[in-house]
Curated annotation (Swiss-Prot):
Protein purpose: Catalyzes the covalent attachment of the prokaryotic ubiquitin-like protein modifier Pup to the proteasomal substrate proteins, thereby targeting them for proteasomal degradation. This tagging system is termed pupylation. The ligation reaction involves the side-chain carboxylate of the C-terminal glutamate of Pup and the side-chain amino group of a substrate lysine.
UniProt entry keywords in alphabetical sequence: ATP-binding, Ligase, Magnesium, Metal-binding, Nucleotide-binding, Ubl conjugation pathway
Entries under PANTHER family matching the protein: PUP DEAMIDASE/DEPUPYLASE, PUP--PROTEIN LIGASE
Further details from the record: The reaction mechanism probably proceeds via the activation of Pup by phosphorylation of its C-terminal glutamate, which is then subject to nucleophilic attack by the substrate lysine, resulting in an isopeptide bond and the release of phosphate as a good leaving group.
Enzyme Commission identifier(s): 6.3.1.19
Catalytic residues (UniProt): 57
Protein name in the entry: Pup--protein ligase
Domain of life, source organism: Bacteria
Pathway per the UniProt entry: Protein degradation; proteasomal Pup-dependent pathway; Protein modification; protein pupylation
Binding-site positions, ATP: 53, 66, 419
Positions contributing to Mg(2+) binding: 9, 55, 63
Single GO MF annotation: ubiquitin-like protein transferase activity
Organism from which the protein derives: Mycobacterium leprae (strain TN)
Length: 452
């Protein structure tokens, strides 16, 4: 499948600092965030004009699921649009607090752990064909995903009673299974719950829940681009060495704690390989695969960065990637503060900086400040993100959903939508079922809109 439907779901951490004596719980702060949404959508679970889904997930975490995208830059742009949508709700909620005499600053973090040790996720979705053995995909993908944090981890300072350690991944400590149908109880690497949101006879949806939430656009593009390439190679029968892991859950933690990538990981059957070895094998296959498939500039950029990051890890000289990979950017930032102020990783200021890196509010968040200074690379523009806040991708089913929602809202009509259904809640209860996520034009939807 050379054209693939992809999407990213991001849960955001919420906290609030209050100016007066009145205090609100995280649940109450989250409800303030969603008041404007509930006022027009009559629910805290809505679809937006840009085709995305916005809702309040378990544990008071706002969640934004991008619309269906079919290329990498489009997906990164719509992922960033989610940050802007949430930031807009943040500003509105702070004004509501002020109007009610509850002064406070709300913070939304695009990260994966809070100070209490709770974890929330960034889930990737990839459409795959129903035909073929799912176990073949999961067998190849598990070692890839366990070691992928080398190239696209968000970075984290892990505080223990004895010391502090810089880790590659925020999510690695919170994963407890390899492949499972659960998402919250056991937190697997790959979720097997079969909800394709498409024609179930043709497709299924690969749901990856092991990844970190990335701030840097190039890291997000690398994360989804390498996974999409891996799927494409598995589907076309590219042979891979067997890197089946003896214990994926132990391995994912071991990899996260080793920024050299050289620590041996135990494979099934008693063999060993380093995370760097495993990633290098996948990179080499991807590089060769690009020579045989039709040209794709975005995949070429992904494979180029993949190779440069592996070279940087091998040499431990990160100068050529220190604006493109989240954990490298963050580690460099920490080292600068440590050198300047002679502080240890255990210093509370480092923990504060670690959190502030993920603050999505422009002009306040540390990552945004780095990006404005040119210290974090981009693949989108602010103009494209602003457009994605208001308009769906034009090449997928999301276009139909977005146009239907816009028309229904403009006409003041009562409607219901989900990923596959568009419904007018009138006497006729007219519904259009959109089972093909690749289809951006549909006469049935045009007629439904024209009837409003």
């Amino acid at each position: 499948m050379q054209r693939r439907i992809m999407g990213i779901e991001t849960e955001f951490g919420v906290t609030c600092t209050f100016h007066g004596h009145r205090r609100l719980s995280p649940d109450e702060v989250a409800r303030y965030l969603f008041r404007r949404v509930v006022s027009w959508g009559r629910s805290s679970n809505v679809f937006l004009r840009n085709g995305a889904r916005l809702y309040l997930d378990v544990g008071s975490h706002p969640e934004y699921a991008t619309a269906e995208c079919d290329n990498l830059v489009q997906l990164v742009t719509h992922d960033r649009a989610g940050e802007w949508v949430l930031e807009d709700l943040l500003v509105d909620a702070e004004q509501r607090l002020a109007d009610e005499g509850i002064g406070g600053d709300i913070y939304l973090f695009k990260n994966n752990t809070d100070s209490a040790g709770n974890s929330y996720g960034c889930h990737e979705n990839y459409l795959i064909v129903r035909a073929g053995e799912f176990s073949r995909i999961s067998d190849v993908l598990l070692p890839f995903l366990v070691t992928r944090q080398l190239i696209c981890g968000a970075g984290k300072v892990l505080q223990t009673p004895k010391a502090a350690t810089f880790c590659l991944s925020q999510r690695a400590e919170h994963i407890w299974e390899g492949v499972s149908s659960a998402t919250t109880r056991s937190r697997p690497i790959i979720n097997t719950r079969d909800e394709p949101h498409a024609d179930a006879e043709k497709y299924r949806r690969l749901h990856v829940i092991v990844g970190d939430s990335n701030m840097c656009e190039t890291t997000t593009m690398l994360k989804v681009g390498t996974a999409a390439l891996m799927l494409e190679m598995v589907e076309t029968g590219v042979p891979f060495r067997d890197f089946s892991l003896d214990n994926p859950i132990r391995a994912i933690r071991e990899v996260s704690h080793d920024i050299t990538g050289r620590r041996p990981v135990r494979l099934a059957g008693g063999r060993q390989a380093s995370a760097l070895d495993i990633q290098r094998e996948y990179y080499t296959r991807a590089f060769e695969h690009l020579q045989t498939r039709e040209p794709n500039v975005q995949f070429e950029q992904v494979v180029d960065l993949w190779g440069r990051q592996l070279d940087a890890i091998e040499s431990q000289d990160f100068a050529k990637v220190d604006t493109e990979i989240d954990w490298v950017i963050k580690r460099k930032l920490f080292q600068r503060y440590q050198d300047r102020d002679n502080m240890e990783l255990t210093d509370p200021k480092i923990a504060q900086l670690d959190l502030a890196y993920h603050d999505i509010k422009r002009g306040r968040g540390v990552f945004d400040l780095l990006q404005r200074k040119g210290l974090a690379a981009r693949v989108t523009t602010d103009e494209d993100i602003a457009d994605a806040v208001n308009h769906p991708p034009q090449t997928t089913r999301a276009r139909l959903r977005g146009e239907f929602i816009s028309a229904a809202q403009a006409a003041g009509r009562d409607f219901t939508v989900d990923w596959v259904h568009l419904k007018l809640n009138d006497q006729a209860q007219r519904t259009v079922l959109c089972k093909d996520p690749f289809r951006a034009v549909d006469e049935r939807v045009k007629r439904l809109i024209a009837s409003m």
